[in-house]
Regions:
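Long, terminal "pre-/pro-" and other extracytoplasmic accessory regions
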Residues: 20-193
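Bacterial N-terminal signal peptides that target proteins for export
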Residues: 1-8
Length: 193
């Protein structure tokens, strides 16, 4: 009896471990990986993290970690990750955007809510109940009250589920997970306002 229980427990733990290993890395997981691709002057000096619009789920798998870098003109070094693998390191010029400043560096020690949890919090907003949420775009920046996640969401259209609609965004404190601002428009999906 104990052997059977041990085998079952081992199988469950093995499955859980393999599922965790297959999970996409979160935005915060990628900061440490990104540190390997930037100079000493930029390590842990993140001014922004942003994702591309997710594909096939609410969790994005293409991320851009933007570091403050005083040694180059735009004052940033950007490391791009696709499915957890570094694919590009550069110093992008952003038209109509001023160079980064040291006061834009996000205080990473204040962050307790990672990108996956921010997406869950945004998706659980009461206005979105009943919608088939499909995609997200997630950004982390320094806000007025500390680090903030901005989660933009897309839903399947009610009238034509093959099409999607931008249903707005939610700003979430990365320190405590509280909703700072909700700018949702469920009517864009054909639901109720």
């Amino acid at each position: 009896m104990q052997i059977k229980q041990g085998i079952i427990l081992g199988a469950v733990l093995g499955l859980a471990t393999s599922r965790m290993a297959l999970a996409e890395p979160t935005a915060l997981d990628l900061i440490k990986r990104g540190d390997d691709y930037v100079g000493v002057q930029s390590k842990d000096k993140v001014v922004q993290i942003y994702s591309d619009k997710s594909v096939a789920s609410l969790q994005p798998n293409i991320w851009h970690i933007v570091y403050f870098d005083s040694s180059v003109f735009p004052k940033i070094t950007e490391v791009k990750f696709e499915a957890g693998q570094e694919t590009d390191v550069g110093h992008p010029m952003r038209p109509f955007t001023l160079p980064a400043k040291p006061d834009q560096i996000v205080d990473l020690s204040k962050i307790t809510v990672d990108s996956d949890r921010a997406a869950q919090i945004a998706a659980s907003q009461p206005l979105l109940k009943g919608l088939n949420l499909r995609y997200s775009r997630i950004t982390l920046e320094k806000g007025d009250s500390g680090p903030e996640w901005k989660v933009q969401l897309w839903s399947a259209k009610v009238s034509d589920p093959t099409k999607d609609a931008d249903v707005g965004d939610v700003r979430i404190s990365a320190a405590d997970g509280s909703v700072i601002q909700s700018n949702l428009h469920p009517g864009n999906a054909g639901g109720t306002e």
